[in-house]
């Protein structure tokens, strides 16, 4: 899915200026990367808030329009208000199509309900890590990674090497020879 966000350069910075922006329905943010100086920006709160609720937005290549120029960016970080449903700040990183990006991608369990551990042994598959750090070109970043649990039995431990990575995507931990556990399979308690 492609996301497009309109942004404007913000001149005033600081706590007071940020509060004024939020009252006007804007989110203060920053755009950095691609060998340029960081730029203080403001984006529409409603657009970003509802986009952040979608899991794919966190790893998507976003078209950010700023001063009539469109840049390819990814969401690098964001802060939420402690108890209101409100985004306080967002960081975008500009990326180049030919340079790999390091990003965390969500992990999904698939086929667990068909596994022997769940069907016959009454067990469950539990994620130890909900995301995996990968390196890929911006166009190759997957929205999520699947962990196939069709063949698991109670007592199994699934590792990074059990995840089938799409072409052009590499696990940061596996590159460092760290085959971390990502899920466990437990049987029914007696």
From Swiss-Prot:
What the record says about family reads: Belongs to the bacterial ribosomal protein bL25 family. CTC subfamily.
Q: Which domain of life is it from?
A: Bacteria
Q: Does the keyword Nucleotide-binding apply?
A: no
Tell me the Gene3D superfamilies matching this sequence. Answer: Ribosomal protein L25, beta domain (2.170.120.20), Ribosomal Protein L25, Chain P (2.40.240.10)
Q: Which InterPro entries match?
A: Rbsml_bL25/Gln-tRNA_synth_N (IPR020056), Ribosomal_bL25/Gln-tRNA_synth (IPR011035), Ribosomal_bL25_b-dom (IPR020057), Ribosomal_bL25_C (IPR037121), Ribosomal_bL25_long (IPR001021), Ribosomal_bL25_short (IPR020055), Ribosomal_L25_dom (IPR029751), Ribosomal_uL5_bac-type (IPR020930)
- Tell me the function of this protein: This is one of the proteins that binds to the 5S RNA in the ribosome where it forms part of the central protuberance.
Naming one, the record's GO cellular component terms include: cytosolic large ribosomal subunit
User: This protein is called what?
Assistant: Large ribosomal subunit protein bL25
Swiss-Prot/TrEMBL keywords: Ribonucleoprotein, Ribosomal protein, RNA-binding, rRNA-binding
* Entries under NCBIfam families matching the protein: bL25_bact_ctc, PRK05618.1-2, PRK05618.1-5, PRK05943.1
> Which HAMAP family does the record cross-reference, listed alphabetically?
Ribosomal_bL25, Ribosomal_bL25_CTC
UniProt keyword annotation of Transcription present: no
Biological process, per Gene Ontology: translation
> Can you state the subunit structure given in the record?
Part of the 50S ribosomal subunit; part of the 5S rRNA/L5/L18/L25 subcomplex. Contacts the 5S rRNA. Binds to the 5S rRNA independently of L5 and L18.
For this chain, one GO molecular function annotation is:
structural constituent of ribosome
């Amino acid at each position: 899915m492609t996301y497009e966000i309109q942004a404007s350069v913000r001149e005033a910075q600081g706590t007071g200026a940020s509060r004024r922006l939020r009252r006007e329905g804007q989110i203060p943010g920053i755009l950095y990367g691609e060998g340029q100086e960081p730029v203080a920006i403001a984006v529409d709160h409603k657009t970003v808030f509802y986009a952040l609720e979608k899991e794919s937005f966190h790893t998507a290549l976003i078209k950010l329009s700023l001063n009539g120029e469109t840049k390819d960016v990814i969401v690098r970080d964001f802060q939420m208000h402690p108890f209101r449903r409100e985004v306080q700040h967002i960081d975008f990183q500009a990326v180049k199509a030919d340079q790999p990006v390091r990003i965390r991608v969500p992990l999904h369990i698939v086929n667990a309900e068909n596994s022997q551990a769940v069907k016959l042994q009454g067990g469950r598959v539990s994620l130890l890590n909900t995301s995996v750090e990968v390196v890929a070109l911006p166009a190759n970043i997957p929205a999520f990674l699947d962990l196939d649990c069709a063949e698991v039995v109670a007592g199994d431990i699934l590792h990074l090497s059990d995840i089938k990575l799409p072409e052009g995507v590499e696990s940061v931990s596996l590159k460092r020879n760290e085959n971390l556990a990502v899920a466990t399979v437990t049987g029914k308690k007696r």
